Amino acid sequence: MLYLNGSPSATDNTSGISLLPEIYNQKFKETTANADIQGTFNLLGQQHEANIGYNWSKYNAQSVYSYGSSLGVITTDLPSWTPEEPTWGDFTYADPEERVMKSVYGATRLHLGEDLKFILGANYTEIETLDYKKNKVSPYAGITYNFTPEYTGYMSYTSIFRPQTVIDLSTKQTAVPVEGESYEVGVKSSWLDGALTGNIAIFRTDEDNFALNPLWDPLYNKYSSPIGTIRSQGVEVGLTGKLTDNLDLVFGFSTFSLKNMESGERGRPNIPTQTLNVLASYTVPQIPKLKVGASIKWQDDIHDTSYSTVKQDAYALLNVMASYDLNEHVMFQVNGNNLTNEKYLTGLSGGQGYYGAPANYTVAVKFKY
């Protein structure tokens, strides 16, 4: 593998970016088993559902790696650049990983009338690694109510118990499982005989032992992070289906906050807190084999302060498409992506990011038999 390091230079013929090589090999094995029983039972004149089950999994991993010296700074004149011959360090065996998870779960859905339903369940999970052994009973519950044939409201509660592989910088060991609680309230809807569906949800999640800023750590050859408590809360809105016989729409918008409860600062600022996705396609009535469409993807600003501040302002991407069914087996399709040639960064983390694809176009012929 090759890692990029450094910052681009704008004053001379060097890019300011050097290459660092690594040899890395990992062997891993995962074994899983599951048993589940489902059934129905009658109570108080209603039929209800229930299920119980057992999950077991075991994960083992062992890795060995060696870092080489820098290949030198890449010049902007690539034909004249000659990389330096690296010298390699000794091979290092990373600490082995082993995780065994066992869980027993049970749940039931109770029909308390034609429109009201309760969901109750619990999950006992035991997690054992080379660094710790933890267990927890995680209950969950939900309620749904059909206000009308078109609208259903719901509320849910879930207890969280999730293993992680990141190194806790305070203990220098694998971080203990994330624990927390999640709440959600929402309404789901269905119109036009199910051709169009919508939803709106409000949620809040509190999590302890959360990896606040995971960065690749050469000392452990895996991600390490300070551990803390976070709260995420927000709103999601969606609409999917047919507005008319010829017009299809997919709409999604979400806004949320992720807060470090100990410092009061924004958590994971490299994750957008607002996103909007709109996709529409239209079948031309006069030419029913022809379909045209467009999509817009937007997100608000993000930034990364792992080593130095790198910021990406809010941006939107515009894509278009057109397809034509020559017959039942052959279809022609043309796509145009990022039509405005927006320049943007993705994957900001650890002081690095990747430029998204510039404006590009594709023509395809698809065969189906």
Predicted feature locations:
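Transmembrane beta-strands of outer-membrane beta-barrel pores
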Residues: 1, 56-60, 122-128, 157-163, ...
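Repeated loop/turn-to-beta-strand initiation elements of outer-membrane beta-barrel proteins
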Residues: 45, 115-120, 149-153, 193-198, ...
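Conserved C-terminal beta-signal and adjacent last beta-strands/turns
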Residues: 50, 183, 269-369
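Gram-negative outer-membrane beta-barrel transporters
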Residues: 114-115, 204-206, 225-306, 340, ...
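Residue-level signature of outer-membrane beta-barrel architecture
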Residues: 39-42, 110-111, 135, 144-146, ...
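Face-selective signature of the C-terminal outer-membrane beta-barrel domain
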Residues: 19-131
